[in-house]
């Protein structure tokens, strides 16, 4: 499938994100698009992937796409079912989570995320859901993958509030603060994919999706992005990935359309 008309933007985001999980042992999943991503990866590039859900489920192998982190299908065949406290304390904070997905209303060039407020904190224009466990996940998971739609209002020079830390002062700064995780490593949007510079911690354009130009990317963010010397076109979803998404994981198109 090479024609963008053959697949949706969400299907491309999901497929591109799932490929980043090749060889990963376990992943803190979450809800929404990451839920579809991880279940697709488990059926393609990472068949041994252990799906970890915030509700206390480790090693989920759901027979269908779970509707939430509390969906009963997650319990069937799971490696372990524990409490949310134990999952965070003895798995996440112990450094046993390889990859976790996060998203947000805003992200900056260093991968810091805002899920708290839009506007002034004391008198916000919009009050968002908040951190939940995102701050702890951002600090303690070995790697963070971010998946979100790209727009100038969400890719901002300065966050209205920093909920979950990225590489705020560079990679060495993060390590000096005692954070056990490596922070964000990749961002996947509906326009492009990004990775983070190992020294500066700054987001770097890695690939652009089929039909997307650099001008499209630049117009959808609040700063001049770093561009990798080997920037390329994002590989489109394969026929098998699309079949799994449309027939197995999300036949109703709740997340993929």
Residue spans for each PLM region:
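Conserved phosphate- and dinucleotide-binding cores of soluble alpha/beta proteins
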Residues: 2, 65-233, 237
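Structural signal for hydrophobic packing residues in well-ordered secondary-structure cores
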Residues: 21, 25, 41, 45, ...
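Short, Lys/Arg-enriched charge-dense amphipathic segments
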Residues: 48-57, 76-78, 110, 125-129, ...
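Generic hydrophobic, helix-prone segments enriched in Leu/Val/Ile
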Residues: 38-39, 187, 245
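A conserved C-terminal secondary-structure "cap"
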Residues: 220, 228-257
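N-terminal active-site beta-alpha-beta segment that forms phosphate/nucleotide-binding
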Residues: 1-78
């Amino acid at each position: 499938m090479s024609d963008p008309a053959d697949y949706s933007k969400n299907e491309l985001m999901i497929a591109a994100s799932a490929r980043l999980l090749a060889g990963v042992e376990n992943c803190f999943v979450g809800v929404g698009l990451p839920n579809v991503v991880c279940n697709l990866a488990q059926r393609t590039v990472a068949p041994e992937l252990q799906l970890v859900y915030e509700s206390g489920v480790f090693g989920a192998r759901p027979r269908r796409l779970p509707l939430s982190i509390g969906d009963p299908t997650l319990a069937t065949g799971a490696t372990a079912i524990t409490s949310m406290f134990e999952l965070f304390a003895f798995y996440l904070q112990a450094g046993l989570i390889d990859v976790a997905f996060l998203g947000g209303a805003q992200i900056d060039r260093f991968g810091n995320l805002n899920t708290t407020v839009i506007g002034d904190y004391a008198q916000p224009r919009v009050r968002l859901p908040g951190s939940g466990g995102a701050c702890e996940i951002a600090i303690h998971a070995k790697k963070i993958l971010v998946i979100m739609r790209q727009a100038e209002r969400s890719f901002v020079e300065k966050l209205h509030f920093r909920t979950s830390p990225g590489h705020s002062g560079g990679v060495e700064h993060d390590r000096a603060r005692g954070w056990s995780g490596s922070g964000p490593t990749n961002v996947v949007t509906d326009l492009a994919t990004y990775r983070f510079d190992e020294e500066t911690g700054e987001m770097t354009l890695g690939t652009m999706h089929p039909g997307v130009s650099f001008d499209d990317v630049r117009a959808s963010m609040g700063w001049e992005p770093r561009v990798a010397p080997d920037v390329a076109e994002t590989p489109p979803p394969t026929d098998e990935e699309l079949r799994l998404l449309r027939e197995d994981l999300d036949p109703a198109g709740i997340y993929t359309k």
